[in-house]
From Swiss-Prot:
One term of GO molecular function: rRNA binding
Organism of this sequence: Clostridium acetobutylicum (strain ATCC 824 / DSM 792 / JCM 1419 / IAM 19013 / LMG 5710 / NBRC 13948 / NRRL B-527 / VKM B-1787 / 2291 / W)
Top-rank taxon, per record: Bacteria
Listed name of the protein: Large ribosomal subunit protein bL20
Keyword Mitochondrion on entry: no
Classification via Pfam families: Ribosomal_L20 (PF00453)
One GO CC term, this protein: ribonucleoprotein complex
Functional description taken from the UniProt entry: Binds directly to 23S ribosomal RNA and is necessary for the in vitro assembly process of the 50S ribosomal subunit. It is not involved in the protein synthesizing functions of that subunit.
Listed HAMAP family: Ribosomal_bL20
Family that this chain belongs to: Belongs to the bacterial ribosomal protein bL20 family.
Any one Gene Ontology BP term: ribosomal large subunit assembly
Cystine crosslinks: none
Cleaved signal peptide residues: none
Keywords annotated in UniProt: Ribonucleoprotein, Ribosomal protein, RNA-binding, rRNA-binding
Length: 119
């Protein structure tokens, strides 16, 4: 079997990693081994962060809806149950936007939910 010289591929890989490590402090931006470790960690954290962002936004929307429903005299869980029973198909993002930007319309949604719960 023929000998494989990796000079071109290795240099290409090093260049790619060092380009990703641009802006890192000290040896982490200059030395391949430390840069590679930092880049791998950064990419892993970015991957995890993209998933955490979804959770964080959902938590934020729920907190906003909960605050707005309690102002109107209803708990979050009862409100969600009421709008599901009423057949209102709105996601939490839309509901939180309405709660912030149009409180009057949101209070009407709360009233609809209350009627469905009591019916």
């Amino acid at each position: 079997m023929a000998r494989v010289k990796r000079a071109v591929n290795a240099r290409k890989n090093h260049r790619k990693v060092l380009k990703l490590a641009k802006g890192y402090y000290g040896g982490k931006s200059k030395l391949f081994k430390t840069a590679n470790e930092s880049v791998i960690r950064a990419l892993r954290n970015a991957y995890v962060g993209r998933r955490l962002r979804k959770r964080d936004f959902r938590k934020l929307w729920i907190a906003r809806i909960n605050a707005a429903t309690r102002i109107n005299g209803l708990s979050y869980s009862k409100f969600i149950n009421g709008i599901k029973l009423a057949g209102i198909d709105m996601n939490r993002k839309m509901l939180s936007e309405i709660a912030i930007n149009d409180p009057k319309a949101f209070s009407e949604l709360v009233e609809v939910a209350k009627k469905q719960i009591n019916a």
